[in-house]
């Protein structure tokens, strides 16, 4: 009996060693223009094409287990509510960078899913938790944070959209940030760009921002314009187009102009931020080779 038990254990170990194991990070994309749900997944395939593994929504505590197999329509992974009832299903296709396909719950609408092969070094960032204190530095540090949405999470970097309630009760506002999850600090994408290449793209972005800003002003009454001038707006000077934050989402880079008229912070609610978005493919020429941004967005 003991000899049989040892044989079974040895056989199981040999089978396990033949399994192919991959780790992925990526996202569910419920709305192609909205926030993502960041995911981390471990997927194991044995020699017969059967899969086991687990995933986590990186901002929630639960680990979800699944099993699956290769089928005609791709890799099908199922999360079971019990022995016979499917709670969730992934239908995935392999690509050069990882996996993509559809996630579908038992009830409700499904979501597109994109998963990239990742490295064990990033496992320490599997659970995403951003310290709100690093988002309270500088402008708006007294305002409360009502929500944080994720635009992209990959390779130890999170691009986020932060909803803020103004301390003075005026219109809520939104800020964008890129966070180094390993060092738990904010980073500026402009530090990782080729200056002359970025300057060329920024000319187009500035031109768009100026045009939109002028159109905004046409909607204001004289008394509102007077208030804005009292708050530091000076149309005789160049617009403050250098006051811009860059942030990535799934497929694009966005220029976010926070305060093109250079008004005092207490009056910024009077003007709406302006955005200019270009595809990442067009922005690649601006990225410094070998930088973290190159590894994040280009894969080199």
Tell what function each PLM region has.
Residues 22-300:
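Compositionally biased intrinsically disordered regions enriched in Thr/Gly
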Residues 2-12:
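Sec-dependent N-terminal signal peptides
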Residues 14-19:
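Sec/Tat signal peptide C-region and signal peptidase I cleavage site
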